[in-house]
Amino acid sequence: MNIQALLSEKVSQAMIAAGAPADCEPQVRQSAKVQFGDYQANGMMAVAKKLGMAPRQLAEQVLTHLDLSGIASKVEIAGPGFINIFLEPAFLAEQVQQALTSDRLGVSQPTRQTIVVDYSAPNVAKEMHVGHLRSTIIGDAAVRTLEFLGHHVIRANHVGDWGTQFGMLIAWLEKQQQENAGDMALADLEGFYRDAKKHYDEDETFAERARNYVVKLQSGDTYFREMWRKLVDITMTQNQITYDRLNVTLTRDDVMGESLYNPMLPGIVADLKAKGLAVESEGATVVFLDEFKNKEGDPMGVIIQKKDGGYLYTTTDIACAKYRYETLHADRVLYYIDSRQHQHLMQAWTIVRKAGYVPDSVPLEHHMFGMMLGKDGKPFKTRTGGTVKLADLLDEALERARRLVAEKNPDMPADELEKLANAVGIGAVKYADLSKNRTTDYIFDWDNMLAFEGNTAPYMQYAYTRVLSVFRKADIDEQALASAPVIISEDREAQLAARLLQFEETLTVVAREGTPHVMCAYLYDVAGLFSGFYEHCPILSAENDAVRNSRLKLAQLTAKTLKLGLDTLGIETVERM
């Protein structure tokens, strides 16, 4: 259940009855402090101004029409006109009981949409590096959340699998008589790529051959297509190993590389010309956009076809958006691409809208993110200043977690230790990123992310096992517990119950904004509230069976919420630590 939505509807009806316009916003929010109740309606200020009355006067009139019987134990006006709402313990108890009867913990399903999520997007013939981490794991958390809510989600891995680099690579492989790319590891291909680029820059004969090979590849020549396909296959096979290690849901079936849109590009350029949006300028085909200005203050020109006939990333992105609407039938498209690409995407989408390829009713959303930085505040690099390979980062995470787990569990069997180290190490890397607001840069710090205190994966995983340990210690009759009533009589019980029942509200925010850090903060809060509840409200030594069973049910909902919440983030839970 979404209590915030329920209260918003009730307060809105009362505001309208008090004379507010039909489109008034009640602005019901979760209260920041317990003394302000569980929820606060802050919409009186804006509406009172429109009505020409004092906000407190409007709030008083709203209260005369507000019926929250059976939901709130107390409703009061605070300050200039805020309405504080304190939830009824019996209502909380009833909702906890309801949540425990469903695998979804009472979370309702919104209207089902088809949502395309563009994320990860590594380049072919290059190993994934830390720069791919944020897009991959933030995008995957969004996918998991949207799917849990019941949407039809299409994962789109926009792989860089087209362009002049393939002419270079094939030409260099051929020169080295190593055409059988299937026998090569990706690390070899990276070395070949560097050598090919060096020769391309320094040897005009080689560069000319590479350009010719690109033309042959683009024209569909069988030999060159086969070589290209091998390069793609090797890359994606290697990347799949990384995806599996990261516990993300991407597979080979989700690859929708740049090459997919290639056949659409000539038609798009012709159509934009026919619509008068694109014009010839100095031999190139350009769209001038009034929405963007150059240094002189004139409309900015966006090239969609070069003088030599080649296409640009913008052209591909126009085709991509068109395809996602017309072919995939998207109701919404989310792009997890770093913030440096924002203007480029905005320009492509402006052209898309002007051309009528995607209607305004279908949102195209750039869920941008900042950079991963080292402790020195500079982009995260190796000690020698090189790019950190993602596989190396995960290896180090596993090794550090292995030492940490072995230190705390010296007698743990090797296979169990390895499984636990993997959950802790990979979870730590992912959670450290996901727990930060994606729009900002963040400092990558091994010590912080592997700590058992604070908002970290190890702490959250431990918090989950701590709740489970209560059930291991208790001799529980599952059927008796299922039929036992929930009784909320202590403040800490009420606070924990109210927060647990805000799970759906949290999921809704993550789904709408693409901000997994909101889920991390929520789960950390739940873990903290359970800790206080556990300390002050004895469970196994409760004064009677009714209280004991009720508190066990609160613990049960806590465990289920932590597990399900961490699952939406792609963080593995463990039974023991």
From Swiss-Prot:
Its EC number is 6.1.1.19. A motif ('HIGH' region) lies at residues 124-132. It catalyses: tRNA(Arg) + L-arginine + ATP = L-arginyl-tRNA(Arg) + AMP + diphosphate. GO terms for molecular function: arginine-tRNA ligase activity; ATP binding. Coiled coil: none annotated. It holds the Pfam family DALR_1. It is found in: Cytoplasm. It comes from the Bacteria. InterPro entries: aa-tRNA-synth_I_CS, Arg-tRNA-ligase, Arg-tRNA-synth_N, Arg-tRNA-synth_N_sf, ArgRS_core, DALR_anticod-bd, Rossmann-like_a/b/a_fold, tRNAsynth_Ia_anticodon-bd. GO terms for biological process: arginyl-tRNA aminoacylation. Keywords: Aminoacyl-tRNA synthetase, ATP-binding, Cytoplasm, Ligase, Nucleotide-binding, Protein biosynthesis. Belongs to the class-I aminoacyl-tRNA synthetase family. NCBIfam families: argS. This is Arginine--tRNA ligase. It comes from Salmonella typhi. The gene is argS.
